[in-house]
Amino acid sequence: MSQSSGTTNKLFKSRQTLLALLKEQGFETKDYEEFSVNEVHTMNNNKQLDMLISNEEGSDKPKKVYVKYHLAKTLRRENINDYIDDLFHLEQVLTKNDTLVIVIKQEPHEPLLNILNQIWESEGIFIIIYNLERLLFNILEHSYVPKHVIIDEAEIKLMKERYNITDDSVLPTISRYDPVAQAIGMRPKDVCKIVRSSKTAITANYYRICSQ
């Protein structure tokens, strides 16, 4: 019973963390915010933990995130292919503007990340995989993590003009698998602004471009 209770508490906390991260990205999370620990326990037993979340109404670029809890067994390429077929092709719940988030019990290993790279390069489908344990806290709330913000094309243009940047290759990179990059939903070629404390000014901005 205690093991079941511990698992339920982890699932409950992971959902809270994911909802907080997605809300920060501009997604409308209220439909999922009021579930209790007992309700999460029941949903886990019935395999109903998945969430489909859209960004806020009136957004210039409508997009969705589908959260899939894959907890029973090791995640394999065939499982990922099945999820892609169901969500992107057969049911067409998601488009290539959207994101599939998969939560697993293991830490994603390099062969699994290589599969995600291949899917992104060949199909343009963006998938984030989280280890359940890493969702027990919100990395964006850590005191040592400076604020990271994905900037739009207009701000990228201004930044390049200001720093006389003519080629993206001169920008420092941040991996799409960096914990903070994942937390803010960065895709390859996205650019983020990092706001850090500075000795010579109250804050200073740094920029990173997302890589595979």
Regions found by a protein language model. Name each.
Residues 1-98, 110-122, 133-138:
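Helix-rich terminal scaffold detector
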Residues 199-209:
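Short, Lys/Arg- and Gly-enriched loop/turn segments at beta-strand edges
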Residues 166-178:
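Short, structured beta-strand/loop micro-motifs enriched in basic residues and often containing a Trp
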Residues 115-159:
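Extended boundary segments
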